[in-house]
């Protein structure tokens, strides 16, 4: 069906090119090339997606300071995530980036990356809730859909490139463009709420107090509200693409209250 649509598009372009003498300078070769690229983008396969995700996370690991295996941050994360093998069949792997930004993300291949500055402000249970939220996006395939959209609107906006039948490696410029697109990507409010719910249940299954979801969001809100702080500006940029934190906090608090779960005493 997609091939038929593509052929119709090419035929339409050919007809349009010869429909008027006034269009004599219409570049038919360029138009058909653009149609080919568009068709390639639309037919991006799961295998191609996997290759691009692998290339992206490899690039990210190379362009950020990854904490060593014996680093305190790594040891803490390893202890927290011990026994977490997969997310709905997708194998998980974890690393810590030693960076100033407060963030965490998960890729479609199950690669979860936690920033050291986030670990600095979160308790173990709060951090586990955030990780659960990110894993929720992987399990629900939000990460895959978001990556595909970012890929096609940034690094592959001109179509899928290939060399000798294989995908061409993305350039540093393309990977940088992809990173920016992913940072600015927006999950729907429904996707974010479902990921929050996943994180909530994730904490319960781990034997932790699910109130930690609300508490982790509360900490992020407090940081977000700090004025004149470079960290705050980065958080404002980050959460401009997320549903309102107050609403998310309220949802998690109501969820825990309705289940009769006591709010932990904050020391």
Task: For the regions a language model picked out, list residue spans one by one.
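Hydrophobic helical h-region of N-terminal Sec-dependent signal peptides
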Residues: 11-16
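Metalloprotease/metallohydrolase-associated module, dominated by Zn2+-dependent proteases
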Residues: 47, 166-217
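Extracytoplasmic and endomembrane cell-envelope/extracellular-matrix remodeling and assembly machinery
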Residues: 39-46, 75, 196, 201, ...
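A short, mixed-charge helix-start or loop-turn motif at secondary-structure junctions
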Residues: 38-39, 62-63, 177-184, 238
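Peri-catalytic and regulatory segments of divalent metal-dependent proteins
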Residues: 26-135, 139-152, 205-206, 225-233, ...
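N-terminal signal peptide c-region/cleavage motif recognized by signal peptidases
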Residues: 19-20
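Post-HEXXH active-site segment of zinc metalloproteases
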Residues: 143-173, 177
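Bacterial N-terminal signal peptides that target proteins for export
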Residues: 1-10
């Amino acid at each position: 069906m997609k091939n038929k649509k593509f052929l119709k598009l090419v035929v339409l372009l050919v007809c349009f090119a010869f429909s008027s003498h006034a269009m004599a300078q219409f570049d038919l070769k360029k138009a058909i090339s653009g149609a080919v690229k568009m068709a390639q983008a639309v037919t991006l396969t799961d295998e191609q997606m996997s290759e691009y995700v692998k290339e992206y996370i490899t690039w990210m690991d190379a362009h950020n300071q990854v904490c060593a295996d014996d680093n305190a941050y790594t040891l803490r994360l390893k202890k927290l995530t011990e026994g977490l093998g997969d997310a709905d069949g997708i194998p998980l792997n974890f690393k810590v980036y030693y960076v100033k930004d407060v963030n965490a993300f998960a890729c479609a291949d199950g690669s979860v990356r936690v920033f050291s500055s986030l670990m600095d402000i979160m308790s173990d249970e709060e951090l586990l809730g955030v990780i659960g939220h990110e894993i929720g996006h992987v399990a629900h395939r939000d990460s895959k859909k978001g990556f595909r959209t970012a890929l096609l609107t940034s690094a592959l906006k001109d179509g899928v490139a290939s060399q000798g039948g294989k995908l061409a490696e993305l350039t540093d410029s393309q990977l940088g463009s992809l990173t920016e697109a992913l940072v600015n990507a927006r999950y729907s409010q429904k996707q974010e709420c479902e990921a929050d719910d996943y994180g909530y249940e994730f904490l319960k299954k781990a034997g932790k107090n699910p109130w930690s979801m609300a508490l982790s969001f509360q900490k992020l809100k407090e940081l977000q509200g700090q004025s004149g702080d470079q960290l705050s500006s980065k958080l404002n940029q980050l959460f401009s693409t997320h549903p309102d934190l107050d609403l998310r906090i309220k949802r998690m608090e109501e969820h825990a209250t309705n289940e009769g779960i006591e709010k932990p005493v904050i020391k």
